[in-house]
């Protein structure tokens, strides 16, 4: 897959946006321009053009603050293009924390506050998907990002999506494939930090074996 061929140490981020038919071609040219400007020219794009729905996958390097800042600038530029063409920031898939900070930009202050009012009526304690659909933190989409450390040339191809787990014959015997890879990556990080005698390392090593 494209994700398996991405540069080592990068993550795979998938988004989907939508435009009206009459502006779709021009809008897509602008989206491709933004992708290229930010070094994501190798993005994989596909979609359902009759619905104006476009998916894309990019592979940013977020292992350092510079990469995170670069990704943040890309997202803001992408949102600007979508809003300029009066498009939708989400099409088939849920909003999620990656787009939540931009919901207000898309719908405007009045409708956004109405959304919050409805949210408080049904979820006064904010326990249902807090911050996933509505979030007042403008930087939430670049916080608590899951980085993928270098561990092994083969394992580095994995994006931890879990799609392989249902087919794995060992998933009910020991660890699932994703669990094993996550532990392997953490062991690699701890070893690089010289923490091979730590309690955490020993516990993970025991689980891995």
Where are these regions (language model features)?
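Structured core elements
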Residues: 18, 44-46, 55-57, 88-91, ...
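Flexible loop/turn segments at secondary-structure boundaries
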Residues: 51-55, 62-66, 96-101, 128-129, ...
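Activity-critical C-terminal alpha-helical subdomain
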Residues: 101-150
């Amino acid at each position: 897959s494209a994700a398996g061929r991405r540069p080592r140490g990068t993550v795979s981020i998938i988004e989907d946006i939508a435009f009206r038919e009459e502006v779709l071609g021009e809008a897509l040219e602008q989206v491709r321009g933004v992708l290229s400007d930010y070094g994501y020219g190798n993005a994989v794009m596909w979609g359902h053009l009759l619905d104006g729905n476009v998916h894309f996958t990019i592979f940013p390097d977020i292992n350092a603050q510079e990469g995170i800042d670069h990704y943040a600038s890309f997202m803001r530029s992408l949102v600007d293009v979508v809003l300029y063409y009066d498009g939708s920031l989400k099409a088939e898939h849920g909003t999620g924390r990656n787009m939540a900070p931009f919901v207000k930009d898309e719908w405007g202050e009045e409708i956004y506050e109405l959304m919050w009012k409805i949210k408080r009526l049904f979820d006064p304690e904010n326990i249902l998907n807090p911050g996933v659909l509505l979030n007042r933190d403008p930087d939430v989409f670049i916080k608590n990002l899951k980085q993928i450390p270098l561990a092994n040339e083969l394992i580095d191809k994995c994006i931890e999506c879990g799609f392989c787990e249902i087919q794995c014959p060992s998933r009910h015997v020991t660890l699932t494939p994703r669990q094993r890879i996550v532990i392997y990556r953490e062991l690699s990080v701890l070893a690089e930090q010289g923490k091979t005698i730590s309690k955490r390392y020993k516990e993970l090593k025991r689980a891995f074996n």
